């Protein structure tokens, strides 16, 4: 039932509303990942391939995933150098290159605020709209089966595929940096880092104090 409903909504968005529909579809894909309902889309893709020989959803999937990677890189740029947040953001970006967005979503883009996630969804929408305008279609499912390159027209489509993904990757980074400068929404990142720093200092002070007490006890025993 969920699959049939999703199939109807996707068909209307992509085929009836053009680039705007593709924007909405791409922007909403990763929220579906958060809820777990995205699994139903695999059946829709299989049906598209069986009936038409092509899969326009794969390109939308691609931009929605790499956009979350862009969000993680945006958080990487905002984090303090050599901090744990910076390491986590970079390590969560890498899986998006092979089609896995969950680490970027939960470890970076939703950690301090919903804004990075929203910026990533908007970036995905921009990439999805471009994919629709460029007419990019896949011949299979999954990240490894994008489009054929046997003739000149599909080689051009491959270039469009890459451009669409670059758009989806860059837009979230730009939006996150601009939003942070204007709204300071990521002040929580700095507060968290300050708290971690204060905790480290406190632990160091306690350790030093314990060592001093131990030294004093040893001196007393010798006396």
Question: Language-model segments: which ranges?
Answer:
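Soluble N-terminal domains of membrane-associated systems
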Residues: 215-223
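Transmembrane alpha-helical segments and their short flanking loops
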Residues: 15, 47, 91, 103-214
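Alpha-helical membrane segments and immediately flanking helix-loop junctions
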Residues: 62-127
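Membrane-interface elements of multi-pass transporters and channels
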Residues: 1, 9, 13, 17, ...
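Membrane-interfacial helix-loop connectors
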Residues: 15, 29-86
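Membrane-interfacial loop-to-helix junctions in multi-pass transporters
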Residues: 10-24, 53-59, 80, 155-160
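Transmembrane alpha-helical segments that form the functional core of multipass membrane systems
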Residues: 1-7, 22-26, 39-48
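Transmembrane alpha-helical segments of multi-pass membrane transport proteins and ion-pumping complexes
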Residues: 1, 26, 30-39, 68-76, ...
């Amino acid at each position: 039932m969920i699959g049939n409903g999703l199939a109807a909504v996707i068909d209307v968005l992509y085929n009836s509303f053009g680039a705007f529909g593709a924007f909405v579809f791409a922007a909403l894909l990763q929220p579906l990942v958060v809820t777990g309902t995205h699994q139903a889309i695999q059946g829709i893709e299989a049906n598209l391939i069986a009936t038409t020989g092509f899969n326009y959803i794969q390109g939308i999937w691609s931009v929605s995933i790499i956009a979350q990677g862009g969000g993680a890189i945006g958080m990487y740029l905002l984090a303090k150098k050599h901090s744990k947040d910076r390491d986590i953001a970079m390590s969560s970006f890498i899986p998006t290159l092979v089609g896995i967005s969950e680490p970027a979503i939960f470890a970076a883009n939703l950690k301090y605020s919903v804004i990075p996630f929203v910026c990533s969804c908007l970036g995905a929408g921009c990439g999805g709209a471009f994919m629709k305008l460029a007419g990019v279609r896949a011949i299979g499912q999954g990240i490894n089966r994008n489009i054929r390159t046997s003739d000149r027209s599909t080689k051009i489509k491959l270039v469009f595929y890459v451009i669409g993904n670059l758009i989806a990757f860059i837009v979230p980074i730009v939006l996150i940096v601009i939003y942070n400068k204007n709204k300071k929404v990521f002040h929580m990142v700095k507060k968290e880092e300050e708290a971690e720093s204060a905790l480290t200092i406190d632990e160091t002070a306690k350790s030093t104090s314990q060592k001093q007490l131990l030294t004093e006890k040893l001196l007393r025993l010798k006396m």
